[in-house]
Amino acid sequence: AGKHRQPSGNKSTHNPTYADPVIGTVSHIGDRGDGYVVVDAHGEEIRCHVPRTLPGEVVEFAVETSNSEARIANAKLIRVIEPSPERVQAACRHFEFCGGCQLQHAAPTAIAEFKTERVRRALIQQDLPTDVLAPAITAWGDNDPAQHGRRRMEFAIQHHGQDIKLGLHQPGSNRLIDIAECPVAASAIEDALPDLRELAALALKAGEQADCHVTATNNGLDIVLTRKREPGLDERLDLPEFLERKGWPRLSWRSSHRAPPETVTAFTTPTITIAGHQAPMPAAGFIQATSAGQDALIDAVMRIVTATGENAYCHDLFCGLGTFTLPLLAQDRNRKVSACDMAGDSLTALRQAAVDYGSRLMVEPRDLFRNPFYADELKGTDCVIFDPPRAGAEAQAEALADSTVQTVIAVSCNPVTFARDARLLIEGGYHMTSVQPVDQFQWSVETELVAAFTR
């Protein structure tokens, strides 16, 4: 499922003022990763978001005064008076300011519990059963250095004459935090931070800014620059030499995050590995954040599909590069899979990766938000898997609710939209038999999950 960081230049300047410090106890962690503390203000309760705090901690903090009538307020942490036993030392020097991570102060057990509870809250909000919810699986890849770290990142870059800034924005602000390290990123990306600054010096003029999308692939870093100005002749002459020197396979440019990337220079096609298959990587294409997370999601999906029996005919909706299509085809030599997505470049890559499967794979470009698969199109289908972006798959869930498909598997990166879609399936006669959270976003509030529904 896709995650999109707000592009640089679209953030507002926020210079809050604060009331006098108060002391309170953190009740729980909210969906943003902030601790919740309730304070009394002239007889009214105000719920305060206090960053970098944990449940049970006694903390001193100051509440923003920008909206004195609000019953929910942001706050800044002053000090932790009584720390939680789950509190740990942050791994990164930039944690207090950078917008990339929210939970570096929490032990892995506390993060897993938070992500499980985040899914539980979403289910409760839709009056859905929680007895089928399993504890979150942590899939950061710590036990395998080759799997550790996020293999896709997007940094903001700014050229200030002699000074190049590269990093992430402070939460709710247009202030760019210039980073010297990023332990959440794959080592191939973190080690290349000086090289990315060198790229910025070549690609940007003084006063310019851009976003730099970086994907760690099997054969080097795949780079996409997002900026308004099209690359000039000098850049098109200089950048290939730079890329060749760094051993990076491709550099692309786009004018906005919605525009298709244009290749500036490419020495080879970047690839990623999915269940043993080498899949060509579209520029700025979507892949799961970590290879360990990808494997955990595949394992969860394949266990459910296996229970449907041999030769099951499957639809893989929002299939992308084939995260589930490829292992589905590999697992059962008699299985047929219909794969669908609106991203044509991803479908092209999937066809290339699955060339050995011949007619067992059917690929269809389709906008599933406007044109979902309806019940009559799903006759004879044994299993449907859908893995939509954060917005969820409301239209497709409504259509599935009217179908006779025996098994539906929902993969989601947003517990709230998942719970909404799950309610539609249950109202249509499905039983939710399992919900498995998967934590592949180390130190972030983002939560993946895999859920099974049967008739």
Segment roles from a protein language model:
Residues A1-H94, S173, H315:
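Terminal RNA-binding accessory module
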Residues A136-P145, D211-H213, S256-P260, Q436-Q440:
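Short, solvent-exposed loop/turn elements at beta->coil junctions and helix N-caps
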Residues A1-V22, D31, L202, K228-R455:
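Rossmann-like S-adenosyl-L-methionine
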Residues S27, A62-N67, A156-H160, T215-T217, ...:
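Short beta-strand micro-motifs enriched in acidic
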Residues P135, G207-T217, L251:
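A short glycine-rich, hydrophobically flanked beta-strand micro-motif that places a catalytic Asp/Glu
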